[in-house]
């Protein structure tokens, strides 16, 4: 698969590169593979922008797990402890919160940074059992960034996904026995193997990777060119 990646304004250019293994096969409609993590605020913003494509395209969503902070223990880590010695550019947090607000998100900075493996396993459960991935993604992001809940906790994950239409009892059983732990690990390995080091990364029709929570107009432009066949197959 050949991929085209773009970053945020001011970022270093991301080169067009080849050598990535194929993402899941794309159908005739617009097929998005969203590589993201639930503790990434820009992933939540990106999801909100991508959702708007559904007004213009027949979109199929596939989730691919990514662990932004793989060293976080199962019980999570306090933000104050994790943030010691870390700084942000002036205005970064205010800009993030305002950008999220513009996307309809009441973004907060939860006091706990959770381990997200259970949340990713819940997403995989939903994917394998006919769940609405848009709703599940939004429910888990909302639980963390807006309700400030610990999405490393089974009860929180089950409640959030249950509100998105997932069978809570079946989900709890799957989380308790680690049914999707190996698949989630495979997805994380796939992402790293294919050079994905930042999220969100959105792969359009298995061929073009757009990095970052880009403006909706850019997402729509890429989707439109692919739908029209303006981009030659490789």
Name each region found by the language model.
Residues 2-59, 63, 124, 128-131, ...:
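C-terminal cap of thioredoxin/glutaredoxin-like
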Residues 44-145:
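Structural alpha/beta surface segment adjacent to cysteine/selenocysteine redox centers
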């Amino acid at each position: 698969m050949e991929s085209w990646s773009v970053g945020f304004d001011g970022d270093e250019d991301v080169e067009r590169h080849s050598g990535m293994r194929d993402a899941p096969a794309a159908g005739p409609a617009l097929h998005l593979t969203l590589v993201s993590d639930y503790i990434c605020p820009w992933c939540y913003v990106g999801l909100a922008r991508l959702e708007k494509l559904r007004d213009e395209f027949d979109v199929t969503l596939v989730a691919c797990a990514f662990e932004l902070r793989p060293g976080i223990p199962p019980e999570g880590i306090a933000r104050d402890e994790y943030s010691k010695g870390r700084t942000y550019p002036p205005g970064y947090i205010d800009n993030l919160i305002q950008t999220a607000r513009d996307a309809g998100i009441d973004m907060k900075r939860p006091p706990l940074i959770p381990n997200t493996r259970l949340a990713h396993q819940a997403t995989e459960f939903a994917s394998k059992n006919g769940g609405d991935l848009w709703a599940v993604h939004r429910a888990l992001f909302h639980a963390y960034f807006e309700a400030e809940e610990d999405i490393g906790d089974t009860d929180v994950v089950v409640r959030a996904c249950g509100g998105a239409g997932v069978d809570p009892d079946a989900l709890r059983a799957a989380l308790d026995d680690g049914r999707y732990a190996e698949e989630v690990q495979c997805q994380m390995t796939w992402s790293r193997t294919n050079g994905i080091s930042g999220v969100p990364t959105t792969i359009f029709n298995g061929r073009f990777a757009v990095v970052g929570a880009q403006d909706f107009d850019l997402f729509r432009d890429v989707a439109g060119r692919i739908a029209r066949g303006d981009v030659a197959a490789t």
